[in-house]
Amino acid sequence: SNAGFNGKTSRQATDLAIAEFDHLSAGDAPFYLWVQYFDPHVNYIPDADAPFQGSLQKDLYYQDVWQTDRELGRLFRHLEMSGFFEQGNLVLTADHGELLGERGAYGHAFWLDEEVLRVPMLIRSPLLPAAEVDLRVSTVDLLATLTELTTGKSLVTDGRSLLPIAR
């Protein structure tokens, strides 16, 4: 199931995700829920209550990141209250970073700088211990990782399972 994107704000994406999660989790079948937050993308249109002020691109970006973080917190609290984390797996990552004036560059489409390539990847599962791992991995590894995490089986792909690192 898919919630977010298509012009939805972070608040709207979270509302959709919570409603869809509640619907899917009421059944007995395993499910996959994809939530995409699009606020921290050009054109930056922050909420009026964002704590950062200013009109520069970097200020507007940080305001959008703040409101997305706020909405992720709301979603995670809902998941926590539902008991999801006792049995469910959660992955949080990003498609790319952003240059905000570093070395005079803006955007992400034409550069391979650290600010563009380095994105967060969080995997939370009742099957894994809490840990922080500072290694270069790739989002291409997610398919093999999630397959092994949910089925116990290895999958031959371009990526590799990250479970040996996480355990």
Residue ranges and their predicted role:
Residues 1-167:
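Catalytic domains that recognize anionic headgroups
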